[in-house]
Amino acid sequence: MHNQYGSIFSITTWGESHGPAIGVVIDGCPAGLSLSPEDFLPAMARRRPGQLHTSPRQEPDLVTILSGVYQNKTTGTPISLLIENKDVSSSSYEQLQHCYRPGHAQFAYEGKYGFADNRGGGRASARETASRVAAGVIAKKILLSQRIETLAFLSGFGTLESKNYPKLSDSLIQQVHTSPFYTLLPQEEIQNLLLLNPDDSFGGVVSFITSPLPIGLGEPVFGKLPALLAAAMMSIPAAKGFEIGAGFSSSQMTGSAYLDAFIADESGVSLQSNRCGGALGGISIGQPLEGRVAFKPTSSIKKPCSSVLKDGTPIAYRTPNQGRHDPCVAIRAVAVVEAMLDLTLVDLLLQHRCTQL
């Protein structure tokens, strides 16, 4: 397995959905950063299950700091964080151990390893992303110390979608964080879709934006900013697509329609538009970073689907009623996308400081 992400500022996540705990080890964090268990509460709450229109699994997701912090200051040594699994219910998975669950990683894991822990998805479960969000809290603290702000929000839910990238502001952050869906979309329309389709699930899109980034983040040629972001976002469970700036729509434009014109004023050189998404040649250029991540519908639904037992016998598979699943994983993925954005930017920020004497 490849459980590490990052170069200078790196994380290693561990644990399974129905194990006693999950966690993450962060290496490369500078010393002297203020950090306490309370710092993790807001971000963990945004990803936590058991809330409106998310999985009913009740996990407090309290973060315990095991190492790397003394007197609420990081020491520069590896930081180890632990999150206990408090609400594990494996009984519904016992009856599923002899069949393949459509859309789940079980078939792939068993084919690769010959054996797999399939309780709640095991290592492939989105439960693993709680560790990423915890690590992202530390990354965000570093970014804020450098006056870099980031935000992710739900920009698509089923057929509802907005492709606009708003300008990042304190009021926008507040609006997203106080929305039950972390979105700028009409909440009533999302609720109606959920009420009209109680046995089905929905896909979604999560957008991310930043304040203007410093020029120079990104390491050509294989460590380009968009390339690393694509890898980070596509590593999130259920992620199915990634774009930066105009993305796929740029393939339908002419060059004259796509190009961002350079302009200059008393503050310096900038772009008149931002269809490039904030990077040229894979390097940040002083513009806001803008991108989107597409998520598939949740695979666990109450409607029947054809499958087979492990001996090849055809069956009509239906998710057990006692199973606990999200109607749309993109809602809780908002916090995960923001965390992976923060982790990527901090790593590139530290790498960039090595490029010039």
UniProtKB/Swiss-Prot annotation:
Pfam families: Chorismate_synt
SUBUNIT field: Homotetramer.
Family: Belongs to the chorismate synthase family.
Cofactor binding mode and count: Reduced FMN (FMNH(2)).
Residues that bind NADP(+): R47
UniProt record, GO biological process: amino acid biosynthetic process; aromatic amino acid family biosynthetic process; chorismate biosynthetic process
Binding site for FMN: R123, A124, S125, G281, K296, P297, T298, S299, S300, R324
Entry keywords, A to Z: Amino-acid biosynthesis, Aromatic amino acid biosynthesis, FAD, Flavoprotein, FMN, Lyase, NADP
Protein name according to UniProt: Chorismate synthase
Catalysed reactions, as listed in the record: 5-O-(1-carboxyvinyl)-3-phosphoshikimate = chorismate + phosphate
Cofactor(s) the protein needs: FMNH2
InterPro entries in the record: Chorismate_synth (IPR000453), Chorismate_synth_AroC_sf (IPR035904), Chorismate_synthase_CS (IPR020541)
Role this protein plays: This reaction introduces a second double bond into the aromatic ring system.
Record's signal peptide: none
MF term (GO), any: FMN binding
GO CC terms, sorted: cytosol
EC number: 4.2.3.5
Listed PROSITE patterns: CHORISMATE_SYNTHASE_1, CHORISMATE_SYNTHASE_2, CHORISMATE_SYNTHASE_3
Protein's pathway: Metabolic intermediate biosynthesis; chorismate biosynthesis; chorismate from D-erythrose 4-phosphate and phosphoenolpyruvate: step 7/7
Organism: Chlamydia trachomatis serovar A (strain ATCC VR-571B / DSM 19440 / HAR-13)
